[in-house]
Amino acid sequence: MEHLYDGVTFPEPENLLDWGPETNGRSFKGQPLEELVRRWKIASKDPDKWWCRYPGLPFSTEGMQRTTARRAAYQKLIRDYMRCGATVDDNIGKLLKTLDEMGIADNTIVVYVSDQGYFLGEHGFFDKRMFYEESARMPFVIRYPKKIPAGERLKDLILNVDFAPTLAEFAGVKMENVQGTSFVNNLEGKTPPDWRKEIYYRYWTNHAIRPAHFAIRSDRYKLIFYYAQNLDMTDTGNFEFTPSWDFYDLQNDPHENHNAYNDPKYAPVIKQMKKQLLNLRKEVGDTDEKYPEMQELLEKYYNKDMR
């Protein structure tokens, strides 16, 4: 796969040249492709840096204009990523072929899943962590011919805590005292009418360019609160960051290019989502009651809006 896609120019995401809060009004800087270029530079000089091991080095954007450099970094990132994906695809093919040869394909559940999504140049980012769609949406493909119709795509809100009870139900095992909910009915085309309408998200690690936050997402809207407190995380450094909110209308702004938190037309929606977010935090037991600094911060930046 080393030379796969050599000479290919991949399409760019529409917001590749998003340069930060000044571009879309978001609350944080994020982890831009320029940071990845810095790591490539370190690895080019010292290949034994374990956290900087990348293919196709040396690579440099020195001497390039800023826009040209970012585009060059994106092309390298996506080319490496696609090569990796092709290798994974080959091996999945071998697995499925073996199941067919063994005669057990129709009675075997095959799941392809990741622990999160990944930025591939969207917003000028690489990596994950932040609650934009590219990072928050997890790849999940499941194959079970005798139970699940092929070629279908669900729009239901599914969480990774739902995986275990789902597989257990397929196996005839009843699970008790788990946070997740089986989505076997959803996969069979019979989504329960009371299926969840919102999901809760939290990112604990606190950093100057990717502050700690929690959030709520419905089928249309997303609300994020960046509280930027270290709490139990002791190695994240000290920095100045004013707690703030981001809000996105995923129907009118699917690529999350404009933070609409201060748009007055969304004020009723935002107020309602803050209430729903509070309820979700209570539901999962994530209320920060043991952190006095968080209670003070929430009173100042959150609770006053609920009155």
Kindly give the residue locations of the regions a language model identified:
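Active-site-proximal cap/lid insertion segments
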Residues: 1-158, 169-178, 232-245, 256, ...
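Signal for well-folded cores of large energy- and translation-related assemblies
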Residues: 54, 287-290
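Mature extracytoplasmic/periplasmic domains
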Residues: 263-266, 289-295
